[in-house]
Amino acid sequence: MSEKLFKLQGEFIEKFPADFMEAVRRQAGKRNGGVKSMLKFMKRSAKGVRAPHEKATAGMETVRMAVPEEVVIPMSMHIGAPARPVVQKGDQVMAGTRIGEAGGFVSANIYASVSGTVKEVIDSFRMVNGTVCQAVSIVSDGKQRLDPSCKPPAVSDKKGLLEAIAASGLVGLGGAGFPAHVKLAADTIDTLIINGAECEPYLSTDTREMLECSETILSGISAVMKFCGIGRCIIGIEKNKPECIRLLSSLTEQIQGVSVRPLPMRYPQGAEKTLIETCTGREVPQTAASGKAGIPADCGCVVMNVTSVSTLGKYLKTGIPLISKRLTVEGNAVAKPQNIEVPIGTLYRDVI
């Protein structure tokens, strides 16, 4: 019977590693309720796997990288329409100067991450994921002069907050790159979930954000809850980050509607739908009432990465748009593993 079930699972089964399949076979081989036990085991395991953590850099403070000689900033680093370049060769720019205008509602403004001179507007720039888009190459002057237009926005309501977020160029910093102002536009949201799971092996960027920037995390959360009319916020953090859990639990203890939820240590715990179900018990519907694919707002939730909401907090305080990103540089080939903050558009060769 078990072999028949394996064949029925087809490609689904083949994707699992050998040690997992051996565990399934052992479970199916039990005399009492073998097939039922096997199916329960597979359902439980389908919620995630226990991947090695490899978080050697979790205790290392973030180091700011020296300004590179050149950056190449793609106009399509986000989900949605590419931004349109608004500079040309020879233009002088400062850190925070807008160089790309959002190409639609689902798009993002893009800013110079260094001060210097536009070397070239590249028509066909191939990204690491294989996609091709326009990009702006800037030769740095090494001074990191900040554009005087970078001033804290005045926000008094939801419309103003969404406009400020759109102006900042903020997109999801957990990997998806979805424009944040679009995600928060829905009126059906009653629960804000902050994703601090960071379930991927090696990465420690969100861990360092929680430990180093808790103030701006909370100010970003406060702004979203206040202006979007959201009454509940759950900060989800995997249990392998006890220091983060303790810190944010103590800081939110007296904040109404905000709580910290320790999460199971499994991959992909930080996946949006998995996180929503773990934190709230709700499920994102496959199909919304409109007939389109369901989204978190259809079950009353919105998920923001912990670094994304912290970046929002920083923008509301300083007016500096999204121009840098923390990276974890780790692995057997790395002589000095570390967490570094780099200007957007920094080349891999300069990071390594």
What are these regions (language model features)?
Residues 172, 192-206, 333:
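Gly-rich Lys/Arg/Thr-decorated short loops/hinges at beta-loop-alpha junctions or inter-strand turns
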Residues 211-227:
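Histidine-anchored nucleotide/phosphate-binding helix
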Residues 34-86, 137:
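N-terminal, Lys/Arg-enriched amphipathic/low-complexity engagement segments
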Residues 120, 125-178, 186-187, 242:
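Acidic low-complexity segments
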Residues 83-92, 96:
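Short histidine-centered loop motifs in beta-beta connectors
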Residues 24, 231-352:
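Hydrophobic alpha-helical positions that pack around
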Residues 93-107, 122, 133-139:
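Short hydrophobic beta/alpha edge segments that flank linear recognition/processing sites
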Residues 116-118:
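Conserved hydrophobic positions within beta-strands
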